[in-house]
């Protein structure tokens, strides 16, 4: 009946992560997740654009709805935010969504492409920043209400 449109994998920072096991090799300086504050790694982040467009969601900010869900997940789990290693394109999507992500370090992937080790804070203020400047803010607020009840 339903089809998966987007998703992300969350791993508590106290467990082995892609950052600690794999991605650390792509950075000049050691990158580690803090284990003294509640946070997580986010990986396997995706949005199926074909599925979005074929399900009459074209023009709807589905990526921002995913970002709201990520924030709600963190807030409910008392995480201060998420750490990730992302491509230049993904970093640009976060910035375009008005999410004030912090670049901790730049690195190079195995393909020689620039990647970023980033921190994405999670809070009600971040959610407001993501929603406030979007022309579909009413739709995003509706999605937010659904997400709060999950």
Report residues per predicted region.
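Short loop segments at secondary-structure junctions
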Residues: 1-2, 50, 121-126
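Conserved beta-strand in the GNAT
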Residues: 3-12
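Acyl-donor binding region in acyl/amide transferases
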Residues: 13-101, 105-107, 111-115
């Amino acid at each position: 009946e339903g089809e998966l449109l987007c998703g992300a994998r969350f791993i508590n920072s106290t467990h082995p992560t892609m950052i600690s096991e794999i991605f650390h090799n792509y950075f000049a300086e050691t990158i580690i997740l803090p284990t003294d504050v509640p946070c997580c790694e986010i990986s396997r982040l995706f949005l199926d654009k074909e599925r979005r467009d074929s399900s009459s969601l074209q023009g709807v900010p589905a990526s921002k709805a995913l970002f709201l869900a990520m924030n709600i997940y963190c807030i409910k789990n008392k995480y201060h935010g998420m750490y990730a290693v992302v491509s230049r394109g993904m970093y640009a999507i976060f910035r375009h969504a008005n999410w004030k992500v912090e670049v901790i370090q730049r690195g190079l992937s195995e393909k020689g492409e620039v990647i970023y080790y980033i921190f994405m804070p999670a809070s009600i203020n971040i959610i407001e920043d993501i929603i406030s400047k979007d022309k579909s803010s009413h739709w995003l607020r509706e999605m937010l209400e659904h997400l709060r009840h999950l």
